[in-house]
């Protein structure tokens, strides 16, 4: 019997690197999984890759109430009430100093990371089973600063405040709410960030980050997925309102 046997999980940003790795791990543990992702080709590839009758996918703009309601209701209609709500969707902005940061880019980034997580909780919690789990993907920079990334860092800190508040409110239903904080991950999303840092600072950002991490490397997506599984499952049955750092000791 798997750790998530028969449980219904929804993952926003589900066709991306961390979402897909988590979906694969959840399916291996017996879950039914709904992937939420705007990119049609990416969704199709994810479904083909996972190749399971227990996975489906839906297009939705997580930053809009209509989109959030739609993916929640689609999940419930397809699989039943939700046990694991994994708010994992993310986007990127430019890597520039705060004095040069475009206001529209700032707003767009917070819309996905912060408003998206808020809407997931607002519309997802009423459709969840008691005793479930909410996971919000933050970042190691949700606990530190990072020059050139004012919008991303602000959003990742804001998610922690959201998590702690929702955890207090959801506790009466035994729903646990936590943030997951990956350090640098070996994927295309992180590479684009590092390319921006390299241009801004005139350094090899990938090497610089590896030197900042005591384990001296980037994480693999499947390592982050294992931590998501921990938060999703009963392994973390007495864990709520906390920040799980998966950063190779970067914040140690």
Predicted regions and their residues:
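Conserved glycine-rich cofactor-binding loop
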Residues: 8, 15-17
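Short C-terminal tail/terminal secondary-structure segment
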Residues: 92-95, 144, 229, 240-252
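Substrate-binding pocket helix/loop in short-chain dehydrogenase/reductase
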Residues: 96-98, 102-107, 209
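Active-site helix of classical SDR
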Residues: 121, 155, 163
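Residue(s) in the substrate-gating loop at a strand-loop-helix junction
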Residues: 139
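C-terminal helical subdomain
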Residues: 179, 187, 203-235, 239, ...
């Amino acid at each position: 019997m798997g750790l998530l046997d028969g449980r219904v999980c929804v993952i926003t940003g589900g066709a991306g690197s961390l979402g897909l790795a988590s979906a694969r791990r959840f399916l291996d543990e017996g879950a039914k999984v709904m992937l939420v992702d705007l990119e049609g080709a990416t969704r199709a590839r994810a479904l083909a890759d996972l190749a399971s009758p227990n996975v489906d996918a839906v297009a939705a703009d997580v930053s809009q109430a209509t989109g959030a309601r739609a993916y929640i209701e689609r999940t419930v209609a397809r699989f039943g009430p939700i046990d694991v709500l994994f708010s994992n969707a993310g986007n990127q902005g430019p890597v520039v100093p705060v004095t040069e940061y475009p206001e529209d880019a700032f707003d767009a980034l917070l819309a996905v990371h912060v408003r998206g997580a808020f809407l997931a909780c607002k519309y997802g919690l009423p459709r969840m089973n008691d005793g479930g789990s909410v996971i919000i993907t933050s970042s190691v920079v949700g606990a530190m600063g990072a020059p050139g990334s004012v919008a991303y860092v602000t959003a990742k800190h804001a998610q922690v405040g959201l998590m702690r508040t929702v955890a207090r409110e959801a506790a009466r239903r035994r729903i646990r709410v936590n943030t997951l904080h990956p350090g640098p991950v070996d994927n295309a999303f992180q590479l684009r960030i590092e390319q921006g840092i390299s241009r801004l600072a005139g350094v090899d950002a990938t090497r610089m980050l590896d030197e900042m991490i005591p384990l001296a490397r980037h994480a693999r997506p499947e390592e982050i997925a294992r931590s998501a599984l921990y938060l999703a499952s009963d392994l973390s049955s007495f864990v709520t309102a906390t920040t799980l750092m998966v950063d190779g000791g970067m914040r140690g």
